[in-house]
């Protein structure tokens, strides 16, 4: 009997993908560009267009970056799907991380391919200092990256514990 692979976590990619594109659609339908609605004293919903990547990286270039980021999202997503296929379903943290990154990357890729930019709308600030505006896909990618870091520390701790047990057994 074959074991279930990490591909069973792709439902999480689909959830991140759909929620991201749905929220972007709502923002585009309900907000004018740069319109901002105050939600909390440190948080606005603000419709902006990001022509670059995270923190508007490469946004001021002539347009080649759109194709670069589309290809990058496809390559990374393909690689992570391959990793999911190789992983055992019991590797829950790593599989969840990969799935969230895939969902976020593909959602931003579809947005970029369809619109030529990515819709961002979460705007956190303190006084005059604003954190770069972001979206659900960015959150999924960041949570996925954080889970990978957590998994790496967890794996390293297990290796150290296994070595200690091995040393005790040799005495």
UniProtKB/Swiss-Prot annotation:
Entry keyword Nucleus: no
Catalytic activity: Release of signal peptides from bacterial membrane prolipoproteins. Hydrolyzes -Xaa-Yaa-Zaa-|-(S,diacylglyceryl)Cys-, in which Xaa is hydrophobic (preferably Leu), and Yaa (Ala or Ser) and Zaa (Gly or Ala) have small, neutral side chains
Span of the signal peptide: none
Membrane topology: Multi-pass membrane protein
Active site: 120, 138
Database matches in PROSITE patterns: SPASE_II
Transmembrane segments: 8-28, 64-84, 99-119, 133-153
InterPro entries with a match to the protein in the record: MFS_trans_sf (IPR036259), Peptidase_A8 (IPR001872)
Record key words, sorted: Aspartyl protease, Cell inner membrane, Cell membrane, Hydrolase, Membrane, Protease, Transmembrane, Transmembrane helix
Subcellular location, principal: membrane
E.C. number(s) listed in UniProt: 3.4.23.36
EC class (word): hydrolase
GO molecular function: aspartic-type endopeptidase activity; endopeptidase activity
Any one Gene Ontology BP term: proteolysis
Location(s), subcellular: Cell inner membrane
GO cellular component, one term: plasma membrane
SUPFAM superfamilies: MFS general substrate transporter
Pathway: Protein modification; lipoprotein biosynthesis (signal peptide cleavage)
HAMAP family registered for this protein in UniProt: LspA (MF_00161)
Family in the record: Belongs to the peptidase A8 family.
Known function: This protein specifically catalyzes the removal of signal peptides from prolipoproteins.
Protein name: Lipoprotein signal peptidase
Gene field: lspA
């Amino acid at each position: 009997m074959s074991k279930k692979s990490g591909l069973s976590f792709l439902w999480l990619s689909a959830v991140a993908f759909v929620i991201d594109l749905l929220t972007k659609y709502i923002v585009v339908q309900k907000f004018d560009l740069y319109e901002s609605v105050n939600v909390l004293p440190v948080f606005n919903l603000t419709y902006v267009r990001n022509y670059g990547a995270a923190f508007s990286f490469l946004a001021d270039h002539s347009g080649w970056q759109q194709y670069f980021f589309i290809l990058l999202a496809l390559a990374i997503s393909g690689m992570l799907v391959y990793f999911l296929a190789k992983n055992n379903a019991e590797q829950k943290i790593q599989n969840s991380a990969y799935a969230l990154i895939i969902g976020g990357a593909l959602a931003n890729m579809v947005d970029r391919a369809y619109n030529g930019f990515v819709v961002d709308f979460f705007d956190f600030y303190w006084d005059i200092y604003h954190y770069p505006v972001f979206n659900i896909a960015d959150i999924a990618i960041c949570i996925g990256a954080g889970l990978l870091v957590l998994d790496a520390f967890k794996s390293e701790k297990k290796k150290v514990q296994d070595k200690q047990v091995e040393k005790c057994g040799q005495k």
